[in-house]
Each structure stands twice: as structure tokens, then as C-alpha cells.
Amino acid sequence: MITYTSDIAKITEENLQGFFVGWAKPLSPNQHFEHLAKCAYFVAALENEKVVGFVTALSDGVGCAFIPLIEVLPEYQKQGIGTTLMQKMLEFLKHINAIDLMCDEEVQGFYERFGMKKMNGMGIRKAR
């Protein structure tokens, strides 16, 4: 059974395996843990103690938030976990006026289901 948590005490580096596959510069489990711990908000999907998905948000807690990462392990995709992660994150952010994220064109439809709209933006991306 999949459970969801925002309690960093329930996450360890050991149960953050298998993420960032295909990235040129993937985060190590240590870096991943540090990212979760330092984000303003995070939600992790757990099967037993194993993290099978997560979403994070950076925010000033008042007017704006940015969702830099959402990922579900390949073997757990197409089970509604990503949808639940986004729903839970957007619930955390419901008091925020501007919520942004960047994504590839092929997944824009996923985010449109949550009321997000395509916008123009700028950024720097180092090799991932």
C-alpha cells in the first residue's frame, strides 16, 4: 500500500534509490535527501519505507512557489501516484498566488489537469 508523508524523519538516504535515471548529472541519494530536507515543502510516496515518488516546492511561503522536481519510479508509474503527489503539493500551496514549474512539452497535459497553463519563461539548465 502506498502512503504519503512530508516528515523528513521518515526518509533516509538508503530509501532514496533509483531516481534521476538518464540524467547527465544525477543527484546522489545524499544530495537528494539534502534537497528534500531544504525544500519549503515536499511530499514523498512510500511503499513500506521505500520512497517510490516525490514532489518538492521552493517557496517564500507568501506569494510564489516553484516546483522543481516530481518523479515516480518507473515501476510505479501509471498508478495515480504522480497525480496524488501533485494534489497533495497543491493543497500545501493553496495560499500561494503564483505556482510555477518547468516541464517538457510531452507532459504538459498532466499539469493542465491541475489548472496549470502554458507560459513563456527563461532559465539556465546545466546538463542533467
Map each language-model feature to its residues.
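Small/polar loops that bind or transfer phosphate-bearing groups
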Residues: 8, 68, 102-103
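Conserved beta-hairpin
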Residues: 35-55
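Conserved active-site alpha-helix within GNAT-family acetyltransferase domains
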Residues: 95-128
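Short amphipathic alpha-helix that is part of the acyltransferase structural core
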Residues: 1-30, 122-125
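A conserved beta-turn-beta hairpin within the catalytic core of GNAT-like acetyltransferases
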Residues: 59-67, 77
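Conserved acetyl-CoA pyrophosphate-binding loop and the N-cap/start of the following alpha-helix
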Residues: 76, 80-85
